[in-house]
Regions:
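N-terminal leader/linker segments that initiate helical-solenoid repeat arrays
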Residues: 11, 17-66
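Canonical tetratricopeptide repeat
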Residues: 32, 66, 100, 132-135, ...
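Register position in tetratricopeptide repeats
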Residues: 39-40, 73-74, 104-108, 139-142, ...
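Structural marker of alpha-solenoid helical repeat scaffolds
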Residues: 56, 90, 123-124, 156, ...
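Residue-level recognition of tetratricopeptide repeat
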Residues: 60, 94, 126-129, 160, ...
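TPR alpha-solenoid repeat register
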Residues: 63, 97, 129-131, 163, ...
Length: 265
């Protein structure tokens, strides 16, 4: 799941640490203890302490999201779903709860559930709303829905506010769906590449893969070569170059690449 733990901790502390009653103090103590255990990767102890805090305050949206997030980390998706839904019962239309729940539903191919919760997103121009309609289109194999969602995403830079790797992987997966999906995906990838490529290797690889799939070989080669020149740890990029040259049957460049790789050993 793509939730930022550092942000969650800051928000959690600011919301949970309130009041001075003994019950509040006990809740805060258990929550902070749970956070500390989680940071040490002791997920079982973290969950135990979160649950103690939950027994004191069952209506805290941040705490409910933290418990759900931990259940996802433990691979217990049904339990996670339940806690995200509890958070939405307390605070309907909470975007963070909806975002995390919809991500989880998508991972499990739960289309009917996604259809239920997507309309609860208030801002119809938000990235979260358009992202989940795009994903629903993928699950339903609905080319029109995919195209319309990508058009909206590509026309608004909100998707750049937070790096979402799973979105770019999904984007690359629909490369061959239609000319329009290629057009809109290209716009999105170009913006993401400009924003993230200096500090994020993964966007370079995903974008290059996309370009190779749509047979934009020279453009793919260009971004891979730029990365290789500026970075030492670049074996993955060499592998992608090999894939590229193999697909376009460029025997001369393949031979040159083999020589470079032999010299790197």
């Amino acid at each position: 799941m793509a939730m930022n733990k550092k942000i969650a901790v800051v928000i959690g502390l600011s919301i949970l640490i309130s009041g001075c009653s003994s019950a509040n103090k006990e809740k805060n103590y258990n929550f902070i203890k749970g956070l500390n255990e989680y940071q040490k990767n002791d997920k079982v102890s973290a969950l135990e302490n979160y649950k103690k805090a939950y027994e004191i305050d069952k209506n805290n949206v941040v705490l409910l999201n933290e418990i759900a997030y931990l259940y996802v980390d433990l691979g217990k998706y049904e339990e996670a779903e339940n806690y995200y839904k509890k958070a939405l019962e307390v605070k309907p239309n909470d975007e963070n709860s909806l975002k995390n729940l919809l991500q989880l539903l998508y991972l499990q191919n739960k289309r009917t559930e996604m259809e239920k919760y997507i309309p609860m997103i208030i801002d119809r121009n938000s990235f979260v709303y358009n992202l989940n309609n795009f994903r629903l289109g993928i699950l339903e194999n609905d080319e029109d829905k995919v195209e319309k969602s990508l058009l909206k995403i590509s026309s608004n830079d909100k998707f750049l506010e937070e790096y979402n790797e799973s979105f770019y992987i999904d984007l690359a997966s629909v490369a061959g769906l239609s000319d329009n999906t290629i057009k809109y995906s290209n716009i999105i990838f170009e913006k993401a590449y400009r924003r993230y490529s200096n500090k994020n290797k993964d966007i370079v690889k995903i974008y290059a893969n996309f370009l190779i799939e749509i047979k934009e070989y020279r453009k793919a080669e260009d971004i891979l070569m730029k990365y290789i020149v500026n970075n030492e740890n670049n074996l993955d990029e060499y592998v992608l170059l090999k894939t590229l040259y193999t697909k376009e049957n460029n025997k001369q460049k393949l031979e040159n690449l083999k020589k470079i790789l032999r010299n790197k050993k």
